[in-house]
Amino acid sequence: VRHFDAGKTIMNSNLYTTTIVPMMRTLENLLVLIDKAVAFAATKKTGEKDFTDALLNDRLVFDQFPFIRQIQIACDNAKAAAARLSKQEPPSMPDTEKTADELKARIQKTLEFMKTVAPESIIGNEEITITMPPYYKKQYGGETLSGYEYATQYALPNFYFHATTAYAILRKNGVPVGKSD
């Protein structure tokens, strides 16, 4: 698919440019958000504790994951998309992060993996069959998705849900981030 502007080709759309590229950009934006959160927290105190810890462990509502887990899941979704769409198994990353620096390192590790996935290994994989993890069948009722279905109905929506929720947690706490962040 090509996008046109006054007869000029702007870019070619494919599974890589519509899935992996925007995920990588959003992960890079999350690095900036974490830096802004740390800078903001340095100006606040909650008793004797640094406000950074409060931010990282806050959540929007009681039954939702905290900021740290939102970042971990966003990274998991991004690396899984890059892996599954290129017919690989996603690399394992244990969820051990407790600090802003550790979260940033996880994002960097995710980006490093995604950069190893060649666009050519994903382009044209709209019709591949992706076997979903066991929890998917229990929650959603299916075992497999096409590459296109996986990207558009699972990977992208889940990734953006968790990235946006992380952003919303920071906004809720007064961190000066805006739409352009």
Segments predicted by a language model, with ranges:
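Long, well-ordered alpha-helical segments
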Residues: 30-45, 163-170
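Acidic interhelical loop/turn segments
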Residues: 42-56, 116-151
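Amphipathic alpha-helices that form helix-helix packing interfaces
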Residues: 23-26, 30-33, 37, 74, ...
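Short, Lys/Arg-enriched N-terminal segments with co-localized hydrophobic residues
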Residues: 1-10
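Short, helix-capping/interhelical loops that line the mouth of catalytic, cofactor-
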Residues: 71-113, 132-135
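Alpha-helical scaffold segments that form or flank carboxylate-/histidine-based iron centers
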Residues: 12-25, 48-76, 94-104, 140, ...
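C-terminal or internal capping secondary-structure element at the end of a domain, subdomain, or sheet
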Residues: 148-181
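Short alpha-helical "patches" and their helix-cap loops
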Residues: 42-51, 87-98, 170-181
